């Protein structure tokens, strides 16, 4: 099976996900030789959508490369952590904990949970210069591989490989790290799913543009200011920064919704073996600490 995946990965292109979507929903736009009929595709759109030629996009070194990484299938395997899972408190757990590279972990999750996840929260590297972030996704591509797969020249291919090999912490490296992970997270979300992403001043502007690219600017919900240090950080220049941010995007803003008015008073909560909770709109909502356990897996 792994050999088949490796063979299929050899043929993956940066726009493979988009091509798959077009083939699924617009099969009549593909000719017998596999070429895409843009004129026929335009016929589907002309009376149903306003078209603009004044858009803008985020560009960075390695963008097509990171899109290709999102399309590659993982060549790792999941190995259950039997010692952890056999503990009495974990035997009947319904949760899953995967330990390993998060890019591979997301791809494994997609095999079972694509389009099923209601809510995702991630706390990525902030790329502050002191948080230890360096780009470390390792793939055995050559300059010739990237020239062929990405349709770029040798100079740009070499720059991408140099960036990936030296463990860069540049803005481009951070964006290249984040792009495939956000794309895979989007694929996990249900049609009414939402994602929350913590970040600070160092990359919040880039993250906003990146999320607009992945989720669509129309699916932006909010950028929350989150106070995390009321006194302010001592190493701040000019102004003592006391807060970070939480970006919120939906898979589809038209159908996304939030449960309103979760009570905070203890008198409005119920306590059981799993922790404090309230019932709101017919749904159980956990509040505060809880005692849910996890099943642990490690992938190789």
Where are these regions (language model features)?
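Conserved small/polar residues in nucleotide/adenosyl-binding loops
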Residues: 298-299
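A short acidic (Asp/Glu
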Residues: 108-109, 131-132, 205-210, 234-237
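Conserved nucleotide-binding/hydrolysis micro-motifs of P-loop NTPases
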Residues: 125-128, 202-204, 228-231, 253-255
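Flexible, glycine-/basic-rich loop-and-beta segments that form/coincide
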Residues: 232-287
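Conserved S-adenosyl-L-methionine
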Residues: 219-230
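DnaQ-like (DEDDh/DEDDy) 3′-5′ exonuclease domain used for proofreading
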Residues: 1-121, 126-180
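Short, surface-exposed basic-aromatic patches at helix termini and helix-loop junctions that form
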Residues: 111-114, 209-217, 240-241
